[in-house]
From Swiss-Prot:
Lineage, top ranks: Bacteria, Pseudomonadati, Campylobacterota, Epsilonproteobacteria, Campylobacterales
Every tr-type G domain range: 1-244
Naturally occurring in which organism (per UniProt): Campylobacter jejuni
Keywords tagged on the record: Antibiotic resistance, GTP-binding, Nucleotide-binding, Plasmid, Protein biosynthesis
Pfam families xrefs: EF-G_D2 (PF22042), EFG_C (PF00679), EFG_III (PF14492), EFG_IV (PF03764), GTP_EFTU (PF00009)
Highest taxon of source: Bacteria
Molecular-function annotations in GO: GTP binding; GTPase activity
Protein name (Swiss-Prot/TrEMBL): Tetracycline resistance protein TetO
Length: 639
């Protein structure tokens, strides 16, 4: 059986969840249509998803059409969740990108199409809601060519009499994009030679599979118009990316979720081989797991199964496998360009409104962060505050909704701030000697610190020989230094520097590794005070697509948001701006873009890295640190 893993992507409210329901219903997988408005759909499982009409988490369902099984990955549709969209894209064989006939090309549509192009995934356009009043399809086609790709091929005609309908487009004009993209076909066309239809279809299929030509289909998912034709196209046009002739197992985890009973499930795409119940599978050089339970999506539901074939998706109850874990032979994993998850750039504190729910909150955050690589948290050992780091503001809204709906926890979140870092300004050295007051430890430690280029991270080197100071003492110094790097002079993590252990002395038998471990952060702190530190803040690359009249406004607003526009291009009455901007300014910049372009502007961003902070920034008060504060107090007391 041919298995296709299909992604459905769209801007908010374009109808992708409704289309999923229509595909399941038309194929016979379900007997009754679910409704987004009534909250009865198979894929949107959270109240927030139903209330706002957006998909937040990736859901998996399936249907069968003749001898083809189609697994539908109903991917998220909000900009703050593109990281999960990218992760979902990595398991797809193809995608359907919805365009609302009424709303046209939205900013989110362009961002999703951009991601599909980067991943080189074969894509079909489905123009939805064609039965609404005031639809101008020729204008939608023009907009698609201008804002998405000129390489579209309109495969259907839309009629109005006696009622709205879709039929095959047999006009020769539809093949223009195919002919213009092939020199041999273009030469035939220019010389007036006849074409064989098989030549055109073969070239269309080649370019479609390469992700450079995009067929356009039409319908109304809400009324099941055009759904059957779309199913037939999906079953015939898309191919499974599973390598042929491979019997050895290879699979990869692309999603983790927890059930209401707190069972942990991992979603695995099988790329080759077959997974059987009771198989013992290697997941690393030293670790294996036994498959004791497994489920596969079948006709709109999940069913227990004894096998999962190549190309299919399998759900395993498992507490060991992590996102991107590989089952079996890693060499057989398809070589596809993956997009790395960006680092969280924002942090805040979260607290429960009812103190008795604190442990429930911590357990919930552990599960949520396990499922979402863009969320991290830790508990301050002294203040006991729960510190969250994440990527976007809407992510916080979703976390609060999950906490309330799934875990029944009411939480309060403080105003978030950007995560800064610190780098030494110059080289400096500092030494604290044994038996020299106020040093209370049986140890001498001398450290040097110097700045490195931004992006280098922390590099540690010991210049004290093991013959002079044994390994346990050396390890203790390194542990103390790295611990001390957690907070610099402004309370942020220290990075992009080289720290050298220059001098050490111990007294036998009274010295212990703890003496070196406790003294090292104090020495590092003094070295940092001599060196001074500069604040670094996260920067983003941005790419803005907006109406040409926005150009002057963009340059006018750039200094206000510390943005640096490095290139400008005019294309099809549209301006394309590229540049860099501090992450702390991007949300307001985006809001202004949306406001001044009436929602037509698009802003694509990716993390550039950290750069010296400019303009107004927020210093973080030094967090109480029981270990270092106690040692610091001892020094002051003995001084």
């Amino acid at each position: 059986m041919k298995i296709i893993n299909l992604g459905i992507l769209a801007h908010v409210d374009a109808g992708k969840t409704t289309l999923t329901e229509s595909l399941l219903y038309t194929s016979g997988a379900i007997a009754e249509l679910g409704s987004v408005d009534e909250g009865t759909t198979r894929t949107d499982t959270m109240n927030l998803e139903r209330q706002r009409g957006i998909t937040i988490q990736t859901a998996v369902t399936s249907f069968q059409w003749e001898d083809v099984k189609v697994n539908i990955i109903d991917t998220p549709g909000h900009m703050d969740f593109l990281a999960e969209v990218y992760r979902s894209l990595s398991v797809l064989d193809g995608a359907v990108l919805l365009v609302s006939a009424k709303d046209g090309i939205q900013a989110q549509t362009r961002i999703l199409f951009h991601a599909l192009q980067i991943m080189k995934i074969p894509t079909i356009f489905f123009i939805n809601k064609i039965d609404q009043e005031g639809i101008d399809l020729p204008m939608v086609y023009r907009e698609m060519k201008a804002k998405l790709s000129s390489e579209i091929i309109v495969k259907q005609k839309v009629g109005q009499h006696p009622h709205i309908n879709v039929t095959d487009n047999d006009d020769m004009e539809q093949w223009d994009a195919v002919i213009m993209g092939n020199d041999e076909l273009l030469e035939k066309y220019m010389s007036g030679k006849p074409f064989k239809m098989s030549e055109l279809e073969q070239e269309e299929n080649r370019r479609f599979q390469n992700g450079t030509l995009f067929p356009v289909y039409h319908g109304s998912a809400k009324n099941n118009l055009g759904t059957r034709q779309l199913i037939e196209v999906i079953a015939s046009k898309f191919y499974s990316s599973t390598p042929e002739g491979q019997s050895e197992l290879c699979g990869q985890v692309f999603k983790i979720e927890y059930s209401e009973k707190r069972r942990r499930f991992v979603y695995v795409r099988i790329y080759s081989g077959t997974l059987h119940l009771r198989d013992v599978i290697r997941i690393s050089e030293k670790e294996k797991i036994k498959i004791t339970e497994m489920y596969v999506p079948t006709n709109g539901e999940l069913y227990s199964s004894d096998t999962a074939c190549s190309g299919d998706i399998v759900i395993l109850p498992n507490d060991v496998l992590q996102l991107n874990s590989i089952l079996g032979n890693e060499i057989l994993l398809p070589q596809r360009k993956f997009i790395e998850n960006p680092l969280p750039m924002i942090q805040t504190t979260i607290a429960v409104k009812k103190s008795e729910q604190r442990e429930i909150l911590l357990g919930a955050l552990t599960e949520i962060s396990d499922c979402d690589p863009l969320l991290k948290y830790y508990v301050d050992t002294t203040t006991h505050e729960i510190i969250l780091s994440f990527l976007g503001n809407v992510q916080m809204e979703v976390i609060c909704a999950i906490l309330e709906e799934k875990y029944h926890v009411e939480a309060e979140i403080k105003e978030p701030t950007v995560i800064y870092m610190e780098r030494p300004l110059r080289k400096a050295e500092y030494t604290i000697h044994i038996e020299v007051p106020p040093n209370p430890f049986w140890a001498s430690v001398g450290l040097s610190i110097e700045p490195l280029p931004i992006g280098s991270g922390v590099q540690y080197e010991s210049r004290v020989s093991l013959g002079y100071l044994n390994q346990s003492f050396q390890n203790a110094v390194m542990e103390g230094v790295l611990y001390g790097c957690e907070q610099g002079l402004y309370g942020w993590k220290v990075t992009d520097c080289k720290i050298c252990f220059e001098y050490g002395l111990y007294y036998s038998p009274v010295s212990t590794p703890a003496d070196f471990r406790l003294l090292s952060p104090i020495v590092l702190e003094q070295a940092l005070k001599k060196a001074g530190t500069e604040l670094l803040e996260p920067y983003l690359h941005f790419e803005i697509y907006a109406p040409q009249e926005y150009l002057s406004r963009a340059y006018h607003d750039a200094p206000r948001y510390c943005a640096d526009i490095v290139s400008t291009q005019i294309k099809n009455d549209e301006v394309i701006l590229k540049g860099e901007i501090p992450a702390r300014c991007i949300q307001e910049y985006r809001n202004d873009l949306t406001y001044f372009t009436n929602g037509q502007g698009v802003c694509l961003t990716e993390l550039k890295g950290y750069q010296p902070a400019i303009g107004k920034f927020i210093c973080q008060p030094r967090r109480p640190n029981s270990r270092i504060d106690k040692v610091r107090h001892m020094f002051h007391k003995l001084a």
